Curated annotation (Swiss-Prot):
Region (CD4-binding loop): 362-372
Glycosylation sites: 87, 134, 140, 151, 155, 183, 197, 234, 241, 262, 276, 289, 295, 331, 338, 354, 360, 390, 394, 404, 447, 459, 611, 616, 625, 637
CDD domains: HIV-1-like_HR1-HR2
Protein name listed in UniProt: Envelope glycoprotein gp160
Fusion peptide: annotated span: 511-532
Post-translational modification comment from the UniProt entry: Highly glycosylated by host. The high number of glycan on the protein is reffered to as 'glycan shield' because it contributes to hide protein sequence from adaptive immune system.
Length: 856
């Protein structure tokens, strides 16, 4: 009985151990995650691409900028859309913005294209014999001299190249350079044009007025322009108020120095921007919040236009000048300018604390840098800005004017201007332009929206900082407008872990993987969590192809508007390049989806298991707390690896499907008798026979080794050895009866086929016996496991019933106890309340009884 009890206890321990092990396996199992591909998620990366321009230029206009714009730009979108990206922070850097470089190249193209049909004045690079020209001012009836205008004669080639004749023309003193003669005491009467030794001079065409029009820069399909809307953004660093646009605002390509004209204004207060305020070599861009009007005038004059033939099909325009053509000036309100300087000083003092701010004139250089140069009505003005930058501001904010001239103390600051006809071009070294004189009065009114300043270096311990007007690098002009934009590339593919797995034809070889990229027509879901953004994939995915189609329509409209010209300029090539790039990116993404087996799907599951080394965040952290941009940064280093694993997994899946389809050829019974199949049968039969023969040889060798170890050496496998009989059993035939000895020899066979048959028979019997034994063992094990499992289930069922009954009884007892306790408590409470009420009711009686006793 004791042994039986011990055995029964061991049985229970084994059952309990099995159940605990199973429960531990279930609880310790981690749910497997799989890579899922998403198409159309809001993710972008910084990129450089070819932008195209849009403008509202009229095709019939002859102004140079508008002619260029109609050839180069598409019409603007009448309903531009701007989508604010909630919960998005993006880094901007205005000093490393490729949009600035593109605009710089485009404006150079604008000027070059405007001047391309104009005449080069290389034949005028000859010796000029000049004398001073007196000009009559017909309004005041006075003679103006001083050598401002030179009347120069020179020899020039006519339409016939071997013929030379003498001509004369009027040049301004600033446009010619004297040539010294051998005799130093002689008067300088020999001159040359100022840029002949360094530049190729081009004469501006008569129709060129250089009047800038707003130009919008647009991103091609598959790209987007991010815009920073922070009102105090300094040009670098993170921006929290971000939106996405397809095109920038209209930017006027105004070429000027020192002062920025007709640009955009800061929304709240003045903003100063510099790549490094401590480096005095870096330009400081001042962005004003209120414009200061500047009115420039060149008084009326009469120009009798004449032209000189300088070769076949080329003419040089000059003329007789009546009136002082060089007398020009610009007016600025003193109060507005001083108020603007005061606000600029406050902002500069934030960077240079407790220092006196000094504004001074330019330190020298080319005339374009020393003066405020700009174009007004086709004439190039060079205005002296000394009066604008001639003040000192101490720490208390009080200004001290550097010049006490009474004329300056008026309400208006008047800047004297000079006009040049030979201009040093800003596009690069070695280019110059001759602007023919323009008759009549010239007026232009502009708005100063910014300043370009440079800071003097030197002793850092000095108590004052000197700022001077700068400029000359037109990239700073464009940078002052493009500071809040950046171009990004939309990545339409994204990958993330999910619990869903693709159902495929099973096979063991599998890969691992996950990650992605994404596309976005509108990036409105960029700040949403991954779970929320995945619900808008259809809208965003459609934007990619529709954006390509829209861009193609814009290009075709532009070509149709110019079909009478059909000039495929560099801008036409840019348009085509942008469209081809968008199509290529779209096809590349579709190709990847096809390779991964996800064609036409926005959400595509895979058989690639998610590796925790890529990201060990939980599903809730990923889908409910992270945006797609944050997730992209998390797994960016593993994107290529996951793409490769998805591709390998899909290749394996296709191989599995191919092998499955190959089994269909056995569906037809007639295919079993194909000669190809018969050859395959013969090959399999030969392999089986060879294997059996090899097994027979192995078993024979093992048998010999076994018998040798027992001390028995057979003479031959085919020798028939008689069986010895005991002394009590005489020799006889088999038919005589009696049990023969077990040690008798095996049957002797003759011939190769008989030997093979005997071996096959023995091998089959051996295999049969072993398989039968194995089957019996497996059956016994399964029966034992089934019985034990059934007993375990019954035990668990009884245990469950027992505990259910116990829990039920406990619950009933608990409810009864609670009911009894509540009832008793309720009775006590009622009794106490009754006593209190009776006591209160009996108070008057007790009082009366007390009074009665007192009276007695």
């Amino acid at each position: 009985m004791r042994v039986k009890g011990i055995r029964r206890n061991c049985q229970h321990l084994w059952i309990w151990g099995t159940m605990l092990f199973g429960m531990w396996m279930i609880c310790s199992a981690v749910e497997q995650l799989w890579v899922t591909v998403y198409y159309g998620v809001p993710v972008w990366k910084e990129a450089t691409t070819t932008l195209f321009c849009a403008s509202d230029a009229k095709a019939y206009s002859t102004e140079a900028h508008k002619v260029w714009a109609t050839h180069a730009c598409v019409p603007t979108n009448p309903n531009p859309q701007e989508v604010v990206l909630e919960n998005v922070t993006e880094n901007f850097n205005m000093w490393k913005n490729n949009m600035v470089e593109q605009m710089h190249e485009d404006i150079i193209s604008l000027w070059d294209q405007s001047l391309k049909p104009c005449v080069k004045l290389t034949p005028l690079c000859v010796t000029l014999n000049c004398i001073d020209k007196n000009i009559t001012d017909w309004e005041n009836k006075t003679i103006i001299g001083g050598g401002e205008v030179k009347n120069c004669s020179f020899n020039i080639t006519t339409s016939i190249r071997d013929k030379v004749h003498k001509e004369y023309a009027l040049f301004y003193k600033l446009d010619v350079v004297p040539i010294k003669s051998n005799n130093d005491s002689s008067t300088y009467t020999r001159y040359r044009l100022i840029h002949c030794n360094t530049s190729v001079i081009t004469q501006a065409c008569s129709k060129v007025s250089f009047e800038p029009i707003p130009i919008h820069y647009c991103a091609p399909a598959g790209f987007a322009i991010l815009k920073c809307n922070d009102k105090k953004f300094n040009g670098t660093g993170p921006c929290t108020n971000v939106s996405t646009v397809q095109c920038t605002h209209g930017i006027r390509p105004v070429v000027s120095t020192q002062l920025l004209l007709n640009g955009s204004l800061a929304e709240e207060e003045i903003v100063i921007r510099s790549e490094n305020f401590t480096d005095n070599a870096k330009t400081i861009i001042v962005h004003l919040n209120e414009s200061v009007e500047i009115n420039c005038t060149r008084p009326n004059n009469n120009v009798r236009r004449r032209h000189i033939h300088i070769g076949p099909g080329r003419a040089f325009y000059t003329g007789e000048i009546r009136g002082n053509i060089r007398q020009a000036h610009c007016n600025i309100s003193r109060a507005k300018w001083n108020n603007t300087l005061k606000q600029i000083v406050e902002k500069l003092r934030e960077q240079f604390k407790n220092k006196t701010i000094v504004f001074n004139h330019s330190s020298g250089g080319d005339p374009e840098i020393v003066t405020h140069s700009f174009n007004c009505g086709g004439e190039f003005f060079y205005c002296d800005s000394t009066q604008l930058f001639n003040s000192t501001w101490n720490v208390t904010g009080i200004s001290t004017e550097g010049n006490n001239n009474t004329e300056e103390n008026g309400d208006t600051i008047t800047l004297p201007c000079r006009i040049k006809q030979i201009i040093n071009m800003w596009q690069g070294v070695g280019k110059a332009m001759y602007a023919p004189p323009i008759g009549g009065q010239i007026r232009c009114s502009s708005n100063i929206t910014g300043l370009l300043l440079t800071r003097d270096g030197g002793n850092s311990s000095s108590r004052e900082e000197i700022f001077r007007p700068g400029g000359g690098n037109m990239r700073d002009n464009w940078r002052s407008e493009l500071y809040k934009y950046k171009v990004v590339k939309i990545e339409p593919l994204g990958v993330a872990p999910t619990k869903a797995k693709r159902r495929v034809v099973q096979r063991e070889k599998r890969a691992v993987g996950a990650i992605g990229a994404m596309f976005l027509g509108f990036l409105g879901a960029a700040g949403s969590t991954m779970g929320a953004a995945s619900l808008t994939l259809t809208v965003q995915a459609r934007q990619l192809l529709s954006g390509i189609v829209q861009q193609q329509n814009n290009l075709l409209r532009a070509i149709e508007a110019q079909q009478h010209l059909l000039q495929l300029t560099v801008w036409g090539i840019k348009q085509l390049q942008a469209r081809v790039l968008a199509v290529e990116r779209y096809l590349r993404d579709q190709q990847l989806l096809g390779i991964w087996g996800c064609s036409g799907k926005l959400i595509c599951t895979t058989t690639v298991p998610w590796n925790a080394s890529w990201s060990n965040k939980s599903m809730d952290q990923i889908w409910n707390n992270m945006t797609w941009m944050e997730w992209e940064r998390e797994i960016d280093n593993y994107t290529s690896l996951i793409y490769n694993l998805i591709e390998e997994s899909q290749n394996q899946q296709e191989k599995n499907e191919q092998e499955l389809l190959e089994l269909d050829k056995w569906a037809s019974l007639w295919n079993w008798f194909s000669i190809t199949n018969w050859l395959w049968y013969i090959k399999i039969f030969i392999m089986i026979v060879g294997g059996l023969v090899g097994l027979r040889i192995v078993f024979s060798v093992l048998s010999i080794v076994n018998r040798v170890r027992q001390g028995y050496s057979p003479l031959s496998f085919q020798t028939h050895l008689p069986t010895p009989r005991g002394p009590d059993r005489p020799e006889g035939t088999e038919e005589e009866g009696g049990e023969r000895d077990r040690d008798r020899s095996v049957r002797l066979v003759h011939g190769f086929l008989a030997l093979i048959w005997d071996d096959l028979r023995s091998l089959c019997l051996f295999s049969y016996h072993r398989l039968r034994d194995l089957l019996l063992i497996v059956t016994r094990i399964v029966e034992l496991l089934g019985r034990r499992g059934w007993e375990a289930l019954k035990y668990w069922w009884n245990l469950l019933q027992y505990w259910s009954k116990e829990l039920k009884n406990s619950a009933v007892g608990l409810l009864n106890a609670i009911a009894i306790a509540v009832a008793e408590g309720t009775d006590r409470v009622i009794e106490v309340v009754q006593r209190i009420c009776r006591a209160i009711i009996h108070i008057p009686r007790r009082i009366r009884q007390g009074l009665e006793r007192a009276l007695l």
